[in-house]
UniProtKB/Swiss-Prot annotation:
This is Probable CAAX prenyl protease 2. The record marks H213, N217 as: Transition state stabilizer. It is a multi-pass membrane protein. It is an enzyme of class 3 (hydrolase). The lineage of its organism: Eukaryota, Fungi, Dikarya, Ascomycota, Taphrinomycotina. Protease involved in the processing of a variety of prenylated proteins containing the C-terminal CAAX motif, where C is a cysteine modified with an isoprenoid lipid, A is an aliphatic amino acid and X is any C-terminal amino acid. Proteolytically removes the C-terminal three residues of farnesylated proteins, leaving the prenylated cysteine as the new C-terminus. Disulfide bonds: none annotated.
Length: 271
């Protein structure tokens, strides 16, 4: 039971921290893309994830160092994640020819608060809290690998439900839209959490899950319907989209790493 309480506590620390600063608190006129709101929330979640890291170390001891960088496993994780985006990558690089503007886009991202939130601070703070803290706590409680992969990410999905409250403040009567948004967001964040939890359990390093998270956020959700360029390009895109899913499944084994560090969690009475 204690493992659930600690995990919920860490989740609460993370979510509540978003509203620490008055400028970032929910209100009908709140614009979450306002640079001041983004800055306040980025500072808050970094502090929250740091607190969770300290508490985790106190609970399970110093036996795990999540800040090592296993280069081979990082590259394989990124390559595996990229397979499911073969279609979107074709759209960006071939159809839209975004490679011509790569350095311009890179410069814009480095000076754009939204990009920093979505691609760097958000993934970093979330992976620290929901993978590097909650997952080792579950391991220390003696949970099986399968249970950790499928249960722990539910908290990651729940942590995004607060967006529903903000949505209803802006659109008070849009209950159906809010419910749909909640279900969709909870579903895809939980499923994504299954994958990054698998990566973390396979490496016990922050970086594979963080960099995969950052990459996926930069790509966004793939286009699932509609025209992509001309007719031939549309056919190629959807063919590659399906092929990417197949390759992702067939190459799953490249992410079944032997842990690059021997982590023996100090079993503590958390159940």
């Amino acid at each position: 039971m204690r493992v659930y309480l600690i995990s919920f506590f860490f989740t609460a620390i993370y979510v509540v921290s978003l509203y620490t600063f008055p400028v970032a608190r929910p209100r009908p006129s709140l614009n979450r893309n306002d640079p001041k709101v983004i800055t306040a929330r980025c500072i808050s979640v970094l502090l929250a994830s740091s607190v969770c890291c300290i508490l985790t170390r106190l609970i399970i001891g110093p036996s795990l160092n999540v800040f090592t960088f296993p280069t081979d496993q990082v590259l394989k994780s990124l390559l595996h994640a990229a397979t499911i985006f073969i279609g979107p990558l074709y759209e960006v690089w071939i159809v839209d020819k975004e490679y011509r503007l790569f350095f311009i886009h890179l410069k814009d991202c480095l000076s754009n608060a939204i990009a920093w939130r979505n691609i760097i601070i958000g993934p970093l703070s979330e992976e620290l809290t929901f993978r590097c803290c909650i997952v080792p706590i579950c391991e220390a409680a003696g949970w099986s690998r399968l249970k950790i992969i499928f249960v722990a990410p539910l908290l990651f999905g729940m942590a995004h439900i607060h967006h529903t409250y903000e949505f209803l403040l802006a659109y008070p009567n849009a209950y159906i839209a809010a419910a749909l948004q909640t279900v969709v967001q909870f579903s895809y964040t939980t499923v994504f959490g299954w994958y990054t939890t698998h990566l973390f359990l396979s490496t016990h390093s922050l970086f594979p899950s963080f960099l995969v998270h950052a990459f996926c956020n930069s790509m966004g959700l793939p286009t699932l319907y509609g025209k992509i360029g001309n007719r031939n390009q549309t056919r190629i895109y959807y063919t590659l989209l399906l092929l990417g899913v197949l390759i992702f499944y067939m190459t799953w084994g490249i992410t079944d790493f032997n842990n690059h560090q021997d982590f023996e969690p100090r079993l503590v009475p958390l159940n």
